[in-house]
């Protein structure tokens, strides 16, 4: 059995990780892909519960992992709990093509082990401050795709999205990034297309 394409989704608490997965699975479900999602929380399975209530994915395609302690460790140094959750999900669904793995909320420094995920997405929101892209952080710099979410809030928090874009280019060079408002699906298609391009290449290799 070939492993599905695994996309890691990281970012600070409240940036929109769970909503991104909910919106992406809803959009990509219209293309007929076989998908699943695994969420990480420190002491609860709250994000998994949210997906169960909002996602188009059936309940048996959503799993929650309680990492305990530091959420960074569960996606990098000791990812054994997530490897086990992925294996269990793949055993239940041998047809799985795409799996989203959501990290616990962090402080800009979390990165996924390359053994755990094929590609990583890091998402922030403008309410966390215009300076975030300027500050960098390993999660933002090393991710394959960077997303600036909740751009609709920029006028209310005094953030200049154009400045954030310019700072992102300085921090990430020519690596991909998008701006989104997931509440209205603004920018969602760009993110979905980015994923689908990589998924199609992976499927061709089967």
Curated annotation (Swiss-Prot):
- Coarsely, its chief localization is cytoplasm
Q: Name one Pfam family in it.
A: cobW
User: How the protein assembles, per its UniProt entry?
Assistant: Homodimer. UreD, UreF and UreG form a complex that acts as a GTP-hydrolysis-dependent molecular chaperone, activating the urease apoprotein by helping to assemble the nickel containing metallocenter of UreC. The UreE protein probably delivers the nickel.
Q: What is this protein called?
A: Urease accessory protein UreG
**Could you tell me what this protein does?**
Facilitates the functional incorporation of the urease nickel metallocenter. This process requires GTP hydrolysis, probably effectuated by UreG.
Q: Which UniProt keywords apply?
A: Chaperone, Cytoplasm, GTP-binding, Nickel insertion, Nucleotide-binding
Q: What are the annotated GO cellular component locations?
A: cytoplasm
Which biological process annotations from GO are given for this protein?
urea catabolic process
The domain of life for this entry's organism is Bacteria
Q: Where in the cell is it found?
A: Cytoplasm
The record's similarity note reads:
Belongs to the SIMIBI class G3E GTPase family. UreG subfamily.
> Care to name a GO molecular-function term for this sequence?
nickel cation binding
* PANTHER family linked to this entry: UREASE ACCESSORY PROTEIN G (PTHR31715:SF0)
Q: By its UniProt entry, which HAMAP family does this protein fall under?
A: UreG
Entry keyword Methyltransferase: no
Under the heading InterPro entries, the entry gives:
CobW/HypB/UreG_nucleotide-bd (IPR003495), P-loop_NTPase (IPR027417), UreG (IPR004400)
Q: Where is the signal peptide?
A: none
Positions binding GTP in this chain are 11-18
Q: Which organism is it from?
A: Ureaplasma parvum serovar 3 (strain ATCC 700970)
């Amino acid at each position: 059995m070939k492993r599905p394409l695994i996309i890691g989704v990281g970012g600070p608490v409240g940036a929109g990780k769970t909503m991104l997965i909910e919106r992406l699975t809803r959009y990509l479900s219209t293309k007929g892909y076989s998908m699943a999602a695994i969420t990480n929380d420190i002491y609860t399975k709250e994000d998994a519960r949210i997906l169960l209530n909002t996602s188009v994915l059936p309940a048996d395609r959503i799993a929650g992992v309680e990492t305990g302690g530091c959420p960074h460790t569960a996606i990098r140094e000791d990812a054994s709990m997530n490897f086990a959750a992925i294996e269990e999900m793949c055993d239940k669904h041998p047809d799985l093509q795409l799996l989203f793995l959501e990290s616990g909320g962090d402080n800009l420094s979390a990165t996924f082990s390359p053994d755990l995920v094929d590609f990583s997405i890091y998402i922030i929101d403008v309410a966390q401050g215009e300076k975030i892209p300027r500050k960098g952080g390993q999660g933002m710099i090393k991710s394959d795709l960077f997303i600036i979410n909740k751009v609709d809030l920029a006028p209310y928090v005094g953030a200049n999205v154009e400045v954030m874009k310019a700072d992102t280019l300085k921090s990430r060079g020519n690596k991909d990034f998008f701006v989104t408002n997931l509440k209205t699906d603004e920018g969602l298609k760009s993110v979905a297309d980015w994923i689908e391009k990589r998924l199609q290449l992976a499927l061709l290799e089967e």
